[in-house]
């Protein structure tokens, strides 16, 4: 019997993309060179098909969250295991998109968050009640989902592939993995611990999306707006207790609960963060974490490089902001969405101050911050002691640089107009 999942995993183009992606993620190049060999890939294929392969126990690691001082525990596999898991995950998303509810927006290739954010903003703009909704977070979602829920997903996939229960080799590999609770702790000791969905294992992305399909379906049908990104949800409704009750009634079946510390009631006249943006009514701007990321990226291409020439700094900034990889860039991912003009101008002001500092070599220019207590903007400019002098010593306009507002107007007019301006840089 043909196994379309296994066959899809070993398509040549998929392996080419995998090796390129794995290199960017820092997987050992020696392992990648081995995987370029047809005989190695054939051996992996046969081992999976004949059920003669198991993944090694993962290693616990901690990565920082957006909140300073908070860390998330993830489970990192061996290099070869990570590559195979990535292949499986990509194929599951491609073969079974119907298992992910349309209101779940996480981890899916080509699914931008901009459309969702703009849809939410439109609804907020027409909501007149003081309380507009609830933002909620699952308590340790990846760690606590019960094993039965995970096994049920593997059963459904197996049935969709046309196999009798416990006969499809890829699902059997995953069953062995999730039934084995051996992991290496942070000190390198081999311990036994239930790990839930196992964030860090690529297949955990698919599981995180599909396991709560029941919740997504119920909430999206009952409420004006509902969206979930992994363990973060937002629901537009003026009765928070009703929303919370509905969610708890469903998620408890899967061993999941809401984190009471992260249930946030949303008010009409207050900013809140969602999917990397700050929203209030019809206003959309960048979240605090994205503002800090923007600052770091611009600084890394300008004032953080010793002896950089103004021309090189300009080229690097234009490449990051506008050119990107030829199709996507910072501008194309952000500017069609945000609409707070003062914040756009503040970002642009910071970029120009960085470029001026590369000419004067005076680099104490301050940075960017984000607050939620302003009526019509959130991004603040902290000016350093060299800013005024740098502006006085340089031209008001920077030759070869087009402002962020200018490029935003071009994008909103027509993508071809934007592309023409980029080609002229």
Where are the language model's segments positioned?
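Reverse-transcriptase-like RNA-dependent polymerase core
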Residues: 47-69, 171-187
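A structured, charge-rich N-terminal accessory region that forms the first stable segment of a protein
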Residues: 1-58, 64
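Conserved pre-motif C helix in the palm subdomain of viral-like polymerases
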Residues: 70-100, 192-220
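Right-hand nucleic-acid polymerase module
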Residues: 82, 86, 192, 260, ...
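Conserved polymerase palm-domain catalytic core
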Residues: 123-230, 234-250, 254-256, 266-271, ...
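Active-site-proximal segment of RNA-dependent polymerases
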Residues: 2, 85, 89-146
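Short Gly/Ser/Thr- and Asp/Glu-enriched loop/turn motifs at secondary-structure junctions
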Residues: 56-58, 228-231, 261
